[in-house]
Amino acid sequence: DKIEAKKMAQKLKIPTLPMSKEPINSLKDLKKWIFLIRPPFVLKARKGGGGIGIRAINGEITIGEIFTLALGIRRQMSSAFGDTEFFLEKYLPDAKHLEVQILGDGKNFLHLFERECSLQRRFQKLLEEAPSPSVDEKLREKLIEYAISFAKALKYESVGTFEFLLDQEKNLYFMEVNPRLQVEHPVTEAITRIDLVEYQIRVAQGEKLKISQNDIKKEGWAIEARINSEDPLQNFKPSPGKIEKLVLPGGQGVFVHTFLHEGQEIFPYFDPLLAKIIGYGKTREEAITRLKRALKETVIEGVATNLPFFEILLEEKEFLEGSYTTNFIEKSKILEKLKAPKICKAFLPKKSEITE
C-alpha cells in the first residue's frame, strides 16, 4: 500500500514528495490536489507495480482529461490487482531511482547496499546495477539509515527493497517498499555473495538470521539487462511469437537467468521479460565490457527483442559516465540511433517470412 508506506515514512521523518493524503475518489478531490501540488505530477495506483497503474502529467492538460486518465488507471488496476484506488504525487522527471536491499527476521535487520534502477521505459526498469555509480559514501549512509529505520519500524520479516528518488540537488525522497524478491536481485547477489532466494525461504520458514552486518561485504560491480520480447523501434511494443532459435551467452563474469527454450510460445498477455543477462567485474568498466560481450553472443529469433537497444545504450556517454536518469530514453536520441541501417538488420524478417 503506497499511501500507507508514505505515511509511515513521514512519521519516521524520512522525506517524501508532496502527495494527496488519501485516495482520490471524485472529481472534486482531483481538482483540490491538482491545485495544491501543481504539475508535473503523477497519478499512481495505490497498489500498482511494475510500471502498471502510473501516468505522468507534464504539460497543459485539462482537469477533465486528467480525470479520464484516472478512470483508465482504475480500470487497469481492477483487472491487474483487484484494487481501484489511486493518488496524486509530485513528479520528478529527471531523477535517479535508487533502492536498498534489506533482509530482516523481525528482530535483526541487515542491508545489502544499494542498487540503481534509473534506466526505465514507461516507469518499468530495463537495466539495474549494483552498487550505484551515483552514490558516494555519505549518500550511501543516508540511504541505509532510512531503509534500516523503516525496516525496524515495520519489524520486517523477509527480503525487501526500500526505494527512493534522488533529485538534481541530491535530495532523497522515499518512494515505496517492495516486500518481496525483486527482478534485479542477481546484481546484489553478485557483489555480496549472499543468496537472497535462500534467505527469503529460510525466513519464511521461521528461521532467524545466522549472519550479521559484518558478514556482508560488497566486492566488484554487477549490471543486469532485462531482455524483453518488445520492439524498441515501435516504442517497445510487445512482440509475441515462437522462439525459433536461442543462443545464450557464457564465460567468466556472465550470468543468465531465463526460462526460455526453442519452440516456446511467447504470449502478449504477460510481462515481456524473457531473460536477465548479468555482467560482473572487479570494476564498473569490466562489468560493462563483459555485459557487452554477453549481449553480442545472445541470439533470440522468432520475436523482436530489445537487444539492439542495449547495444546502443552501453556505448552512450551518459551511461558510461553513470549520469543517466529516469527520463534518459525520452530526452536522449537513443531511439533515433536505433533506426540506423546496421541496427535495423536485427529487425528484418527471415527469408521464410517473406512472400512474393
Model-derived regions: residue spans:
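ATP-dependent carboxylate activation and anion-phosphoryl transfer catalytic cores
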Residues: 12-13, 50, 58, 63-356
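A conserved helix-loop-beta module that forms one wall/lid of the active-site cleft
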Residues: 1-48, 53
